[in-house]
Regions:
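Extracytoplasmic electron-transfer domains, predominantly the class I c-type cytochrome c fold
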Residues: 15-161, 166-171
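Iron-sulfur (Fe-S) cluster-binding segments and ferredoxin-like electron-carrier domains
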Residues: 9-15
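The canonical Cys-X-X-Cys-His
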Residues: 2-9
Length: 172
């Protein structure tokens, strides 16, 4: 769902099989990579060419450049999601930062992203003026976000029987 607009420019296919990743085998990561076409070269004739992806390749961007991304998204540039959870950490204040040190809690970024994806509301509260081309999100700073709600229940089916809900998608 997210990959239609957002890139993962700092994530290689091999990362899918590393510890801390989603738990794919090396063979699964290689098979996933091979489904993508990657520009390579030049060959002996000096021409660039496309080849199947390899585990060492990075995920290709959904757009050829920033201008194309902005044109497809109403002037907004979708952020790269490679490091989004590290970039969206937030201070928890006293005494929670002490608790976080003791418990090794480091999930502020993932919690922010999950909240953002679940924070869309069809109608803003009374008195709130939503700029044209924006969507109301109760967790986004300022509450006006250019990204439309990307998730809806039943959109993705899980092989393991996990619930097909916005809450589950946002967590994943």
């Amino acid at each position: 769902v997210c990959s239609s607009c957002h890139g993962l420019s700092f994530i290689a296919f091999r990362n899918l099989a590393e510890s801390g990743g989603p738990g794919y085998s090396v063979a699964q990561a290689a098979a996933f990579a091979s489904e993508y076409k990657v520009k390579d070269g030049p060959n002996d004739a000096g021409d660039m060419f496309e080849r199947p992806g390899r585990p060492a390749d990075y995920f290709p961007s959904p757009f050829p450049n920033e201008q194309a991304a902005r044109a497809a998204n109403g002037g907004a540039l979708p952020p790269d999601l490679s490091l989004i959870t590290k970039a969206r950490s937030y201070p928890r204040g006293f005494p929670m930062f002490i608790v976080d040190l003791c418990t090794q809690f480091q999930e502020q970024g993932p919690n922010y992203v999950s909240g953002l994806l679940q924070g869309y509301e069809e109608n803003p509260p009374a008195g709130f003026t939503l700029p044209e081309g924006s969507y109301y999100n109760k967790y986004f700073p300022g509450h006006a976000i250019k990204m439309p709600n990307p998730l809806s229940d039943g959109q993705v089916t899980y092989d393991d029987g996990s619930p097909a809900t916005v809450a589950q998608y946002a967590k994943d």
